[in-house]
Amino acid sequence: MARPAAVRVLWALLLPLLLGSARGLRNASQRTFTIDYSHNRFLKDGQPFRYISGSIHYSRVPRFYWKDRLLKMKMAGLNAIQTYVPWNFHEPQPGQYQFSGEQDVEYFIKLAHELGLLVILRPGPYICAEWDMGGLPAWLLLKESIILRSSDPDYLAAVDKWLGVLLPKMKPLLYQNGGPIITMQVENEYGSYFTCDYDYLRFLQKLFHHHLGNDVLLFTTDGANEKFLQCGALQGLYATVDFGPGANITAAFQIQRKSEPKGPLVNSEFYTGWLDHWGQPHSTVRTEVVASSLHDILAHGANVNLYMFIGGTNFAYWNGANMPYQAQPTSYDYDAPLSEAGDLTEKYFALREVIRKFEKVPEGFIPPSTPKFAYGKVALKKLKTVEEALNVLCPPGPINSLYPLTFIQVKQYFGFVMYRTTLPQDCSDPTPLSSPLSGVHDRAYVSVDGVPQGVMERSNVITLNITGKAGATLDLLVENMGRVNYGRYINDFKGLISNLTLGSSILTNWMIFPLNTEDAVRSHLGGWHGPNNGRHDKTFAHRSSNYTLPAFYMGNFSIPSGIPDLPQDTFIQFPGWTKGQVWINGFNLGRYWPARGPQMTLFVPRHILVTSTPNTIMVLELEHAPCGDSGPEVCTVEFVDRPVIGAPPTPGHPPPDLSHRDLRLDYV
């Protein structure tokens, strides 16, 4: 009889544990996020819930600073954050997926969860976001006739494969599975796109449910305009709207009610500022206007996401563009409550006070703005021209083609390609080099036998007079300035996308060099000495003093010793420089263009700086450097402790009419 007694004792010990486990499972299964249609609200775990969210794009904020920015958002009174997942950020080449380091979206979402923030996820596949090609990978254009954002079989196959990788990673992070993701957006402002393909939306809806389950809350977002909701909304996807300050809030939500007669009011993008373009004024929206409008939205009982709460930076080549072609700058500051560098602003505290009137705001310490340091001027010397460095920039050598090939055709998705041919005739008198179909996408830096001739620019300068002898080498260094991210023109091919003519003759027999600038910069282009491609041993007298050959410049600087808490964030500016790209310690900070503005400084986050060895700066100046050739041997860049992103527009680039904010809508 000892055996049954032992069993009874063991059972007595195990029973509380088993009951506890059962309660835990039941509690996990009780985590729900649903819509209460009878009371026009969300329910979180069965209780009424309203989210006040802010947009942060993990792809625009260094991982080093994710926690700092998220904490500041929480302390502002937000209970959720919203983020996009840019497909091209994670799948740069077909089948090559990147989910670590800066691309670790799972870690970002888990970090938000640890800090007590819910997550509204917008995985696309198209995201807009002023991001290159709206987040769609450029390699989709390998099929030139592909119809993006539609039921095109090739497009759907790529989407199916991509979301088949991404969504299973997101499933454990759904709220009902113990994670922070409460809702997930399908596509993005689809009603603003010309295809209006309901079969495409149904395909996405089924795909999301297949990977995430049927209890996931899916939604759409469109402009507060009835025509947008006609194509953007679909039964089974909760329709929300977006609009900015100054809009008629009652009228905007009445538009939502035409698609969703019952359910919570939601503004998925309440604009705290606006985007910028090169050559136009920095966009700002007055704090009191944003605060007043937010107050009215919350007074309506609506849910809201503040787009952006922090804008961040378009590092490297990630910026997008709008039509008629205007590229966005490196800074995505957006005049948001947190600045590009994560600094607290007047707008931050004003919006926090508005939120405090409606919801409990966390008490306690708000992480301060990060300290900035002015490291001063750094001398740079000319390293090599692009032409001299071709063997390092393009180790496999050129691709030969009778007619020009696009970036896509040579599988160069970002950066630069050198196009080379010879002049078929003497051009002793200035002779027009033309792109009759405006086929230079986006800027071409033109030289003949090493003599700069000028710049051709998409939709702006399509003809350039050049001189040279028959048989002379004609070089065009073509820059991809960022793909269109909004509207019907997102199939944005780069490079020479149509033939060039010299006089009346079509130019043929091209040598095409796709440039691997990232690897070349990391190797310092092979150092100061090396072959110069065998053609130009001397500096030539330039046809125009306005231009020098595109060239790399390099310098070093050390972080001062004896000062605590260094390195610190800083900003780099380019006095006397014109336009180009800059790297620090191999990290591609992005584009500078002080000749056009409005952005004059680039944000330098401290985590890319080192204290143990000198820091290396590499600059690719495309148009005119303030040193080298006929100028001084050394030129400088300068590190300052304040940003300048709102310089006046340059002559020839008048400010736009911003009387209505969504200028993009004219080009859907």
Curated annotation (Swiss-Prot):
Glycans are attached at residues 248, 465, 499, 546, 556. It comes from Canis lupus familiaris (Dog). PANTHER family: BETA-GALACTOSIDASE RELATED. GO terms for molecular function: beta-galactosidase activity; protein homodimerization activity. The keyword Disulfide bond applies. GO terms for biological process: carbohydrate metabolic process; ganglioside catabolic process; keratan sulfate proteoglycan catabolic process. This is Beta-galactosidase. Residues 25-29 form a propeptide. It comes from the Eukaryota. It is found in: Lysosome. It holds the Pfam family BetaGal_ABD_1. Residues 1-24 form the signal peptide.
